[in-house]
Amino acid sequence: MHNGIRMTTLVKRAMLICAGVLFTYEAALGSVHTALASTENEAKSVQFVSEIQTSLAPKEAPKHYNGQVRKVAYLTFDDGPGKYTAELLDMLKKENAKATFFLIGSNVKAFPDLVKREDAEGHYVGMHSMTHNYKKLYTEGHYVDEMKEDQGLIAGVLGKSPVLTRPSYGSMPGLNEALRNKVVENGLKVWDWTIDSLDWRYNKMQVDAASAKIVENVLHGATNPTEVILMHDIHPQSVKAVPGIIKGLKEKGYELEAYNENEHFPLNFWHDNRM
């Protein structure tokens, strides 16, 4: 009798121990899954940083082709059109590369034929303000007003109204929440950049040496599947650098495309996905 009771007690204890081990194992397994999920989420939250050390909004997931991630580079040129723009367009045409141009209103008036050519050759034409004046655009709050005026000038030349703007000096810190709300209300979009070519820094340097530095800056920064490159077609060294940049980007596997309104993805220093 006593032996039977002891046997029953031992069996119960064994069952409890097994249950405890199973519970501990499942809890541990759950912790592992939780930790993995946490690590995965942290990895997904990593964001790229621009050359001016300002982190960007997440980029659009790269498209795939034949199982490979497509690498796309967007050459963008601010402040034109100008006296070097025709030469730049010749280079782009020769290399079968597309670009995005952000125009100053006064230059739209001065070079309407270049605006037409940019559009006709498959490039995107967007707005870069009327004055390029920080105080007027941001402190006095005229960002949208100037972009709409610039938009109207472009529409007068091309017969269509683009929506993409490039903030003079970048969107941070000037494009505050109130101005961003106004951007959204007016149906405009904003693009900053992922790579700053720093082309303007070399205005006093000999053109060949300056262009070599610009090529180096761009290719060194091109490490992600999607890159948006800031340049200016009003500087001779910038235009001189373009063939080398295109060659280097193609060697890295990039395709050179123009912005497409139907495939817009947010790219601004404020992480504001509305614009």
Where are these regions (language model features)?
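Active-site-proximal beta-strand/loop segments in catalytic clefts of secreted hydrolases
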Residues: 77-79, 102-106, 128-130, 166-170, ...
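Catalytic grooves of carbohydrate-active enzymes
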Residues: 219-258
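Low-complexity, Gly/Ser/Thr/Pro-rich intrinsically disordered linker/tail segments
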Residues: 251-275
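Active-site beta->alpha N-cap acidic-glycine motif
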Residues: 47-138, 142-157, 248, 255, ...
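Sec-dependent N-terminal signal peptides of Gram-positive bacterial secreted proteins and lipoproteins
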Residues: 1-33
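Alpha-helical scaffold elements lining the catalytic groove of polysaccharide deacetylases
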Residues: 133-157, 171-225, 240-241
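Sec-dependent signal peptide cleavage junction
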Residues: 25-49
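Short low-complexity, flexible loop/linker segments enriched in glycine and/or proline
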Residues: 115-117, 141-143, 205-208, 271-275
